[in-house]
Structure formats: structure tokens, C-alpha cells
């Protein structure tokens, strides 16, 4: 990849000038001036997904200039480099090939001259065989009973992705009950184990190195709980499997290495649900549905790799995001799924985006002089409407929003889905067009109120509008369409990282806190006052020790 400071490009300078023209333009006027605006600023993908980006503060010239920025920063060269297996994660000297995990075309993808697809396919075949045995009841616990519950023990990418997908695809789940334990807080594992029978529980320990502090602490607590009932350590192998690459540590734990599912250093944690880390997904919805998830993502991969910039959906969404973040000064983006099954989707891409692009040093090692990754947050609709939409509508912060909804509900209960989707459509309309003072006064007049009677309340009922949104309407949330949607956001993040000249696939920002925690932990084990830190940290530790004594 080329290292190009985006602010030094001619395209960036042109965008700054263009922003001066666009910053006060209202969407009401953009729509009034062009009856075909929706058709020009929307696209349907694979007859499964409609992406409407017409309710943004952009025009055709905006998109042309943003695409010029993508070309000038060599986005297409970077896309080709990723798909070719080049080591674009330079700080860790690694390729970035989550796209290989879902390469349903099975075309060769090489790293260091070696095609990775035979190994990918071998692990998938092993996952399929394992899933069939567990789901069909062939896999038996130490007392001969079939498995009823599966506990995924992981953290970060080893937890957020599988948990999000199994929740999103609950309509496809089988008889197995899934549980996810991530937090090192003992409450998480303790509350989970209270509900389980050791005779019928299978644990998946998800840690590439098998040394992750939170994961291994929880795994050992689960093992201790299991052995209190089972007694014999040989039974561990019937109730624990590993998603790891550390053969020695897995064997030492008591897991049969035949039940160790590997992945590779070119799989980043937050992009790993497509790998063996997704075993909990495959166990929950069945391997055939897991393959459909991979297939949907692969369809979006092919689109991203081949579509011209003006039609490339991940690229368009990424460029619009850069427009708001760097020119309008928007600091956050909200992801708002109007589907309760998708309740963890915002949290998943909170990690996906913020861990990828939350960087202030560029690919040349220089501190940036522009904005990189935004803050990502969100909640399912309509809950959010009764919590934080007030600020989105009438606050002083500009918050671009992605609204996501399925046309077809898995639970067509009465008129619930119609009411849900009426809110979905209404919110984007209200955010875009608002309500003028004249409209408010007219509304009061129709209710028989005079201008004098209502003048004190009118300002509070005015909505400025001009608040940007993207609407992503899915035909139905299926494994295939969910795979497409996840890959859409993954490639949006990649695109922004390339253009903003940062490394999106490392996460050095999580290391310092870990190092300090490892230093502090031994200091908590005795009653001696701590004086080795700053005054605040010393005081906090010493109060903790005093209260715990």
C-alpha cells in the first residue's frame, strides 16, 4: 500500500472548497431540486439488500470529489494488495485475509507463495464433522448423555462476533443452548455455570495463544467446576474443545488436540468469526447455515474487489463517513438496527471500527493532523427513540446514523412489524426534513390555537432537519444476508483506514493497560501499602485493599 497523507492531496483541497459550498445546503432543497435523487443515490445488492444513501448532505459533485480522493490515495491498489495476500499489516508483518476464510469460489489465495485455501478448507471440513457429531447427539459427555449446552469462552473478537451472529440468527438455532462468557469478572462465569449441568455441557475455549488472561482465567474456573462433578481429569476431553494454535498448552489443559481447531496469524481477532472462532455459530445454527453466512460475505467480497468506485457500496459508505468526520466535524456514528435479534450488531462494529481505526499515528509513523476513526455506538429501534434520539434530532451534535431493518420479520406477530418499520421510515424522514416554524404554527392553527397563544412553545417544536442517515433495508435477515451486511461494514472500515493512511489491522492501544495490570496484580495480594504509582493510582489501590481486608 502507498503511504499518502490524504490532506496533502489535490482531492482533499477540492473537498475543502466544496464543503464551503455544501455546509449550509439543506436536504429539503436537494430533494426538491431532483425528483430522481433516490434512484441516483441508492443501490440494490443481490436482490437482498437496498442501500439508500440519498438522505445525506451530498450531491453528485460531492461523490465525484470523494471518489477522486479514493483514487489519489490508491484505494484500488490497496484492495488488490489485501486480496493478493500481501502483508499489508506491516507493524505485525502479516497478511490480512479474512476474505480467504469465506472464499467460496475456492480460487487460490497465497501468502508467501503458498495457497492458504487447502488449510482453510481442511479446518472447515473438521468443523463440519464436529458440528454434525454434537448436533446429532453422537458426541457424548462423560456419563453418556448428549450435549445440550455449549459455552464459548473468549473475549474481544473471540466473543463479540460469535455472540452477535448467534443472537442475530436465533430463528435458525437448533436444540443446543448457547452461552458466552467473556468478562474476567467472576460474576460472568459464576452466573453462567449456575444454569448448567456438567454432564451435558461442552466448553469452547477460544484463544489463539491459549494465554489470554481473561479467557484462560474463565476456562480454568470452568474446568474446576466441571471436575468437581466429573472427578477424573480424563473426562475433560469429552467436554472441552479449543479454538487455538498452541498445541502444547491445549494438551496440558486436558483437551484432546484432535478437538483443537486452528486459525492463522493472518486472521485478525475482530475479523475472525468466519474462522474456527465461529464454531459456536456453526453449532448453534448448523453447519449448512454457517456456510450460507460465509457465502453472503463472499458475495460482498467479490463486489468490493471488482465494482467500480461509483457503484462500490462499501466504498461509498466509507467516503460519506469521511465527509462527515473530517469536514462537518461529526465525531460519532450511530448504528440503529430495527430488529431485536440484531441487538449486538452496534457493539460488534463498535469494536470492529474503533479498534481498527482508532489510531493517531499514520502509516509513516507520524501523528496525523486530521480525524481518523469515529466513535461508534447504537441500540435497537425503537428502544433508542425513547432514550437518545432527542439529541440526534434537536441536539447540538451532528450524528450520522445507519438505520438497518428487514422487510420480512421472523416473528410476524399481529401488526408489530408494521409499527416497527413505520418508525424506521419515519425517523429517517424526520431527521432529513425536520419541521419548520411555519409548519408548527400551521399545526397549532388547525387545532384552533392563535399565534399569541402558542408563541412561547413554537421554538421548542421546530426540527431543523438536515441530519444525515443511511437506510439499509434487507429483504430478510438470513445467514446469507447477514454475511453480506457484516462484510459491507468490514470493507467500509478497511476503505477508511486506507484513505486515512493508518494501519487498520493492529491494536497496540490495548497493550499498555495489559502491561500495567500485570504489574499491579501482585501488588493486590498482600496488605502492604502501595507507593509505586502516581498518587491517584496508589490511593485507589490502597483503598481497595483496605476495604477488602
UniProtKB/Swiss-Prot annotation:
Q: Which family does it belong to?
A: Belongs to the GPI family.
UniProt catalytic activity: alpha-D-glucose 6-phosphate = beta-D-fructose 6-phosphate
Q: Where are the active-site residues found?
A: 355 (proton donor), 386, 514
Q: What does this protein do?
A: Catalyzes the reversible isomerization of glucose-6-phosphate to fructose-6-phosphate.
Full protein name: Glucose-6-phosphate isomerase
Cited PANTHER family: GLUCOSE-6-PHOSPHATE ISOMERASE
Q: Name the NCBIfam families on file.
A: PRK00179.1 (NF001211)
**A molecular function GO annotation:** monosaccharide binding
Name the domain of life.
Bacteria
InterPro entries attached here?
Answer: G6P_Isomerase (IPR001672), G6P_Isomerase_C (IPR023096), Phosphoglucose_isomerase_CS (IPR018189), SIS_dom_sf (IPR046348), SIS_PGI_1 (IPR035476), SIS_PGI_2 (IPR035482)
**Pfam families named in the record:** PGI
Q: What is its main location?
A: cytoplasm
Q: What is its EC number?
A: 5.3.1.9
This entry carries the following GO cellular component terms, namely:
cytosol
What is the gene called? pgi
Organism listed in the record: Edwardsiella ictaluri (strain 93-146)
Amino acid at each position: 500500500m502507498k503511504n499518502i497523507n490524504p490532506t496533502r492531496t489535490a482531492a482533499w483541497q477540492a473537498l475543502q472548497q466544496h464543503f464551503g459550498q455544501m455546509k449550509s445546503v439543506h436536504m429539503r432543497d436537494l430533494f426538491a431540486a431532483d425528483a430522481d435523487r433516490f434512484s441516483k443515490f441508492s443501490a440494490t445488492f443481490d436482490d437482498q439488500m437496498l442501500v439508500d444513501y440519498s438522505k445525506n448532505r451530498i450531491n453528485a459533485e460531492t461523490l465525484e470529489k470523494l471518489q477522486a480522493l479514493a483514487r489519489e490515495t490508491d484505494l484500488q491498489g490497496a484492495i488488490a494488495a489485501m486480496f493478493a495476500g500481501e502483508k499489508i499489516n506491516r507493524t505485525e508483518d502479516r497478511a490480512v485475509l479474512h476474505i480467504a476464510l469465506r472464499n467460496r469460489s475456492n480460487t487460490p489465495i497465497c501468502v508467501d507463495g503458498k495457497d492458504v485455501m487447502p488449510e482453510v478448507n481442511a479446518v472447515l471440513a473438521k468443523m463440519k464433522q464436529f458440528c454434525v457429531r454434537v448436533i446429532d447427539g453422537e458426541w457424548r459427555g462423560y456419563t453418556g448423555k448428549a450435549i445440550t449446552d455449549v459455552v464459548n469462552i473468549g473475549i474481544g473478537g473471540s466473543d463479540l462476533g460469535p455472540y452477535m451472529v448467534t443472537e442475530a440468527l436465533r430463528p435458525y438455532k437448533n436444540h443446543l443452548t448457547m452461552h458466552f462468557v467473556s468478562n474476567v469478572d467472576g460474576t460472568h462465569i459464576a452466573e453462567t455455570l449456575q444454569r448448567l449441568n456438567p454432564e451435558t455441557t461442552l466448553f469452547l475455549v477460544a484463544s489463539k495463544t491459549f494465554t489470554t488472561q481473561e479467557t484462560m482465567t474463565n476456562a480454568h474456573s470452568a474446568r474446576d467446576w466441571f471436575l468437581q462433578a466429573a472427578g477424573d481429569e480424563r473426562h475433560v476431553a469429552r467436554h472441552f474443545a479449543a479454538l487455538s494454535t498452541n498445541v502444547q498448552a491445549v494438551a496440558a489443559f486436558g483437551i484432546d488436540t484432535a478437538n483443537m481447531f486452528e486459525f492463522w496469524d493472518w486472521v485478525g481477532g475482530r475479523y475472525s468469526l468466519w474462522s474456527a472462532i465461529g464454531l459456536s455459530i456453526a453449532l448453534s445454527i448448523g453447519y449448512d447455515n454457517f456456510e450460507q453466512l460465509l457465502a453472503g460475505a463472499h458475495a460482498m467480497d467479490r463486489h468490493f474487489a471488482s465494482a467500480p468506485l461509483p457503484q462500490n457500496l462499501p466504498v461509498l459508505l466509507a467516503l460519506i463517513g469521511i465527509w462527515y468526520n473530517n469536514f462537518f466535524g461529526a465525531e460519532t456514528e450511530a448504528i440503529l438496527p430495527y430488529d431485536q435479534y440484531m441487538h449486538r450488531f452496534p457493539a460488534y462494529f463498535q469494536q470492529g471500527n474503533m479498534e481498527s481505526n482508532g489510531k493517531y499515528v499514520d502509516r509513516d509513523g507520524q501523528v496525523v493532523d486530521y480525524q481518523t476513526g469515529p466513535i461508534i455506538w447504537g441500540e435497537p429501534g425503537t428502544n433508542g427513540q425513547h432514550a437518545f434520539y432527542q439529541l440526534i434530532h434537536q441536539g447540538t451534535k451532528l450524528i450520522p446514523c445507519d438505520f438497518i431493518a428487514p422487510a420480512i420479520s421472523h416473528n410476524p406477530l399481529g401488526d408489530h412489524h408494521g409499527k416497527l418499520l413505520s418508525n424506521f421510515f419515519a425517523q429517517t424522514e424526520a431527521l432529513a426534513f425536520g419541521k419548520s416554524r411555519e409548519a408548527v404554527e400551521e399545526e397549532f392553527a388547525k387545532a384552533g390555537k392563535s399565534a399569541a397563544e402558542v408563541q412561547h412553545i413554537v421554538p421548542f417544536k421546530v426540527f431543523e432537519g438536515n441530519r444525515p442517515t443511511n437506510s439499509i433495508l434487507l429483504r430478510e435477515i438470513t445467514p446469507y444476508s447477514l454475511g453480506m451486511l457484516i462484510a459491507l461494514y468490514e470493507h467500509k472500515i478497511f476503505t477508511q483506514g486506507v484513505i486515512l493512511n493508518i494501519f487498520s489491522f493492529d491494536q497496540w492501544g490495548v497493550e499498555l493497560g495489559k502491561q500495567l495490570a500485570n504489574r499491579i496484580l501482585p501488588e493486590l495480594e498482600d496488605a502492604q501499602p502501595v507507593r509505586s504509582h502516581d498518587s491517584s493510582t496508589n490511593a485507589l489501590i490502597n483503598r481497595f485493599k483496605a476495604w477488602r481486608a
